[in-house]
């Protein structure tokens, strides 16, 4: 775009003796036009063009002005104030803060055709009026560094660019601008040309290794050496990155194993890493039932099946199939992660304990669900059972992960140790007349039954529930034939001592009932021991849909109690203050930060911990207004 030349200055409202308005006519960028003194709010200058031109773009270099406006007029009509038209609306060059601090006074802005007023830009003019203003600062004079006007490009120049070299004068130096279309070296040109030349060759390079890999694979099919097969596997994939090799899981290895010759399958099985067997201690869990079934009736070491390979991703959803879990004592986000892992393994989830529930995964003892399930004889395990099953990709016996606490009883031990696979749902004991003869009939050749001790005979009772307890402990000892017999004796002795304290008054010292079990009258202990056949009580969920946040310090273990109550009544605890929080539980007095929280969320309610305790005592939702935290007068 050709630059429009300026002829002379028609008029100027204010100018400095050194930095006069004529400096705008010169090409030197260091010559400026400034006001005569500081404190003026508006100054203006009128410039005469050489001829009438259509202005296509304007370049303005600032020198301390906050706003600049450009107007155009014609000298033929007298060019009065009313004859000027706005070409460039008032544009900002400095913000108020920049004006007061004096920062960025020489900002340059280029206004193209889209920034100019179209009606004025389409006409021809020979006079330009520039108005500068600075209302924010009175400390220093202001003005312009330079102004450039450009006419529209010619059609011939747009079609065929001019080959002449333009020269820009910058102070005492002249900058020569060369045509960008000239063939010259650019930074990185040789590098990109080398890549373009070598790219066809690199595209055909993988053909060589693939052919060699196919030849090696065909020649090694007859050999049965496993090292050669591994070398083939490494040669057939030369482009595979180490990062990709690390991501190969065991499932992909199992998929590749059937494709190998049968002779290579047998030596590869023993080389798989085996998990260390758990050491047997008096507190260890019994052997899984499927291993016991293979050993029953045969000497040790015969009939044992080889270790099954770890389950792949396609079998991951069948590991805990048939298991229904209930969570207790966990907080989000770990609660949701544990639930997702259990569902990924094929288990089902229930928010509360139901008849089809099989396992209660508890974070710690003495939670409300823990006491409920313990009274119903359910199975309570630790979270490590689900985590280890997910990590090992196979179903582990849940006996190793049983919760050990003061509330455990022989009925719980019986439910946790009995069953075929060790993971079936616990069932209540059934009354059967031939219960006393079961331990003798169930004894196999691999687990010899020793004669009952006097203490066991003394512990015999006509009460059918107590006989079932003795049977459960004895059958446990039979199932654990590989364990030490001392554990079974200690367990029988402990149960016998417990039953001895509950003997009915009419029973003799030798353990025989004088009524021979013919009486229909039940004792108080029997009624107390028999679990009632009632539906599982469900906890109220009056906190459902409500979000809580614990703020500040709480004395003692009050925070843990509040978390338990809110979780038990189906409330949601937030880890941090968010828009979802509805109730803020705090033991402190009114805090100034509460007012800021109310400004962001007017529906917030600040309550005392006593509200949670009262809701637990009444087992219903009470009005929180009676327990609110209010500002002190």
Swiss-Prot record:
Q: Which CDD domains match?
A: BRCT_XRCC1_rpt1, BRCT_XRCC1_rpt2
Q: Name one GO cellular component term.
A: nucleoplasm
Compositional bias, Acidic residues, is annotated for 481-490
Give the Low complexity compositional bias ranges: 221-231, 277-291, 427-443
PTM note says: Phosphorylation of Ser-371 causes dimer dissociation. Phosphorylation by CK2 promotes interaction with APTX and APLF.
State the UniProt keywords alphabetically.
Answer: Chromosome, DNA damage, DNA repair, Isopeptide bond, Neurodegeneration, Nucleus, Phosphoprotein, Repeat, Ubl conjugation
Cite the location of the cross-link Glycyl lysine isopeptide (Lys-Gly) (interchain with G-Cter in SUMO1) from the record: 176
Query: Which sequence positions carry the modification called Phosphothreonine?
Result: 198, 202, 257, 281, 453, 457, 488, 519, 523
Note whether Ubl conjugation occurs among the keywords: yes
Primary role: Scaffold protein involved in DNA single-strand break repair by mediating the assembly of DNA break repair protein complexes. Negatively regulates ADP-ribosyltransferase activity of PARP1 during base-excision repair in order to prevent excessive PARP1 activity. Recognizes and binds poly-ADP-ribose chains: specifically binds auto-poly-ADP-ribosylated PARP1, limiting its activity.
Q: What is this protein called?
A: DNA repair protein XRCC1
- Organism whose genome encodes this protein: Homo sapiens (Human)
